[in-house]
């Protein structure tokens, strides 16, 4: 499964935690923006019910510097949360699925449906498309690197052939 870090408002984080667990993802980091009395208990119940093979770290009320460090340690493949995580996403080269509040760097974010059946299906589509895009980018980079190596090798082979005494 895909390793995901989820952060934001506690209610949204619990919802995205459930959605990701139910769809075979590994939530390696769960970070609600503030401490609430029952968050850890509710999150742990959901995690325990899935019998995961990975360690899930729950950090409540982290500032973004501490969150940044926690994300680096957890090594997720995807981030799920608000726009405030875009710099971490860019630094680490990890895709960000924007969900929750605030989303201030996208037009129409206030109309993104996340509640109910239609919202869950929409989120699953967004998650899946993000995973597919990340895999596409990874494969394209490998292909370009191989092409570059092939071109350098053939160029060097030709150059060395011309430099040989006849």
Question: Where are each of the predicted segments found?
Answer:
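An N-terminal assembly and electron-transfer interface module characteristic of large anaerobic redox
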Residues: 1-166
């Amino acid at each position: 499964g895909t390793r995901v870090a989820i952060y934001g408002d506690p209610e949204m984080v619990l919802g995205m935690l459930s959605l990701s667990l139910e769809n075979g993802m590994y939530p390696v980091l769960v970070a609600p923006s503030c401490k609430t009395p029952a968050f850890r208990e509710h999150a742990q119940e959901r995690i325990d019910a899935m019998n995961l093979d990975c360690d899930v770290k729950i950090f409540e009320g982290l500032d973004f510097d501490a969150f940044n460090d926690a994300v680096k340690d957890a090594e997720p493949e995807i981030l799920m949360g608000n726009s405030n995580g875009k710099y971490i996403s860019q630094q680490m080269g990890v895709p960000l699925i924007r969900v929750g509040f605030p989303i201030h760097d996208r037009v129409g974010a206030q109309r993104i449906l996340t509640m109910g059946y239609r919202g869950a299906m929409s989120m699953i589509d967004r998650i899946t498309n993000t995973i597919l895009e990340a895999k596409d980018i990874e494969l394209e980079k490998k292909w370009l690197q191989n092409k570059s190596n092939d071109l350098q090798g053939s160029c060097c082979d030709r150059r060395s052939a011309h430099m040989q005494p006849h």
